[in-house]
């Protein structure tokens, strides 16, 4: 697995994918985490900037379901195999998020 759960964290810098709007709380049990190294290796920063025009590397970025679909399409078309695999894993989590919330938040490192 390319994404981590809270219990899998080993002290590296991570991006937290958190359900709903940013509320200032971190390290949630139902969040998923991507290490900074994996984020960079998969090239996610360039794909977020291409899809949204911005990405807050050190702060929160809220992503709506519509924006997520746009992002997935770009990665499916242009991303590496690693990027596509990572996005598929995030998407499994996002699907459960969007059943209850209209967005998720990526908390920067």
Model-derived regions: residue spans:
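Acidic (Asp/Glu-rich) sequence patches and key acidic residues
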Residues: 1-105, 109
